[in-house]
Regions:
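Polytopic transmembrane helical bundles with strong interfacial aromatic enrichment
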Residues: 1-246
């Protein structure tokens, strides 16, 4: 019930955002006879797929976030929890991977962004949740098999969705200068920032208060598959921090 409540709150927040800032049912008083048309750079079949795939990945990570908040509220987390979270994380990761790949291919043949990857702030905004989502995916495997890394997995669930919201804010707010920015709006960016502060600030506060109460799980040998996955997690987390600081 708590998981569905968190998901409902996220959906309600973005529904309010759409109604207040981009109401699709708002009547135009003096509509222009002809529109300006789409930016020629965006008139591409790949662009009908690239943004939806990215946002399916972002939204998918909200499920892991909701499960993490539910675990913190009830103070209970186990291998069954990881078994529920891992498929959603994998699905979100696949969508985000396909979205990034499609965007890279489009950037390559448009010859405008410096090749496949230019380390542009908007590109980095999608890479950061992908890196953290990869770490979360590996962490849930360790938790499901060994009942370990409970607190770390919950934290990764919160941070992955945090970076998804942060990426949305950076792209839409106009805070950063990017050749990828086609629809920046500071007003809408502030609304997204408010959503980010509410959910992520609340999630991290709840984590700080409730994480010590989570029962620690099993142990595993440092030289093992699980140990390698932990090293992988640390590398991905460090890479995310490096990209964030560079952005």
């Amino acid at each position: 019930a708590s998981v569905l409540s968190v998901q409902g709150a996220i959906a309600a927040a973005f529904l309010i955002f759409i109604i207040l800032t981009s109401n699709p049912f708002l009547r135009l008083g003096d509509p222009p006879p002809e529109g300006q048309g789409l930016n020629p750079i965006l008139a591409d079949p790949g662009l009908a797929i690239h943004p939806p795939l990215l946002y399916l990945g972002y939204v998918g990570f909200s499920v892991a976030f909701a499960f993490a908040i539910g675990a913190l509220i009830h103070g209970r987390i186990d291998a069954v929890w990881a078994r529920f979270v891992r498929p959603w994380t994998l699905l979100a990761w696949i969508f985000l991977t396909l979205g990034i790949a499609m965007g890279s291919y489009w950037a390559y043949y448009e010859l405008g962004w410096g090749g496949w990857w230019f380390w542009d702030p908007v590109e980095n905004a999608s890479l950061m949740p992908w890196l953290m989502g990869t770490a979360l995916l590996h962490s849930t495997i360790v938790m499901e098999k060994r009942d370990a890394l409970k607190v770390w997995t919950v934290l990764l669930s919160i941070l992955t969705f945090s970076l998804s919201l942060l990426g949305t804010f950076l792209v839409r707010s106009g805070v950063i200068t990017s050749v990828h920015s086609f629809a920046s709006d500071p007003g809408r960016g502030l609304f997204i920032l408010g959503i980010l502060v509410f959910f992520i600030g609340g999630g991290l506060t709840l984590f700080a208060l409730r994480a010590p109460a989570l029962r620690q799980g099993g142990l595993f040998a440092p030289v093992s598959r699980e140990g390698a996955l932990v090293v992988n997690n640390l590398f991905l987390a460090a890479s995310t921090v490096a990209v964030l600081l560079g952005t």
